[in-house]
Amino acid sequence: GKTTFIQRLNAHLHAKGTSPPYIVNLDPAVRELPFDARVDIRDAVSYRGLMEEQGLGPNGAIVTAVNLFATSFDQVIELCEKRATELDYVIVDTAGQIEVFTWSAGGTVVTEAFASQFRTVVAFVADSPACALPQSFMCNMLQACSVLYKCRLPMVLAFNKVDASPHTVLLEWMADFEVFHEALDASGDESYAASLSRSLSLVLEEFYQNLRPVGVSAAVGLGMDAFLGA
């Protein structure tokens, strides 16, 4: 997933000899991080404490934790600004659930705070094997579209796990809706969902032009330079 991807990206940047990235962890529910986060939301807000004290469910606790942390996020921006001349990259690891970060008030505060001070790019990490089926691919593209629409920032679409499932066909589907339609026909699915996917492929054609798709593998390290150059 995304945390493994950030671990690989962090290791790749260290190996290249660039200045170590400044990593900010904004996932309050993660148990262990395989990298050193310079700023960690878990040091300020207890995810499980919120669940117990306020009777919240998992997603509610994550949203509340991010919202609370966002009230003092100017301090994080100040830390990054002080190190700006020394840093090449600031990497922010957010909660994986799109709805609890991208569409939360706290998530908006964080995104806008970074975008107002730094050149900011959103990375949407999609699972390449999970996108192998046309309808699953379309579901992922709709999610990416919603994130791009909300953030209004440049986006890199990283198809992860290409060592297990090459992303070449996914790029073909993005480049030519007729190829995507042929894949839908070959699947034999005549459901309403398949018909909707067919229509959406036409609607999203312009959206694809605003994405920078790359294939990566967090497991074996493929595509990291392509990702950084996207």
Placement of each model-derived feature along the sequence:
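Conserved glycine(s) of the Walker
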Residues: 1
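Conserved GTP-binding G-domain of TRAFAC-class P-loop NTPases and closely related GTPase folds
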Residues: 112-230
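Nucleotide-state-sensitive switch-loop elements of NTP-binding domains
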Residues: 4-121
